[in-house]
Amino acid sequence: DATVSNVVAILGCCMGGMYALKAVGGCRFERSCPFYGMVHVPEAWRGPGQGEPLDALATGDPESVLAVIGTADAWTPPGHVDDLEAAGATVLRYEGADHGFVHDASRPAHRAADAADAWRRVLDWLAG
């Protein structure tokens, strides 16, 4: 189904979610929906030019962020998610959900009911 919208958003999962957070500091997107995107760059990924996602929120509009995160996801530990909320982002936390619970039904971590709920809430937020 085609949808008409005046809002340009970026969505991403995992590393793509981290980059969706980083995009908040730019001017190309009005909303950002990271799905289990890392709030802090993992140590192994750090290098020249690899900025922190929270730095982008500090220069952009953190209220333009709706993050979807599972509470059992080692890539997004609770303290990091708390940092994201403290920066002004809205976070949908799914109790007991692990990394990748929304986007790929073939993954062991997939949770159909939570995935459906997350997509409904994200689409409502984007439409709103």
Model regions and ranges:
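N-terminal cap/leader regions of alpha/beta-hydrolase-fold enzymes
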Residues: 1-128
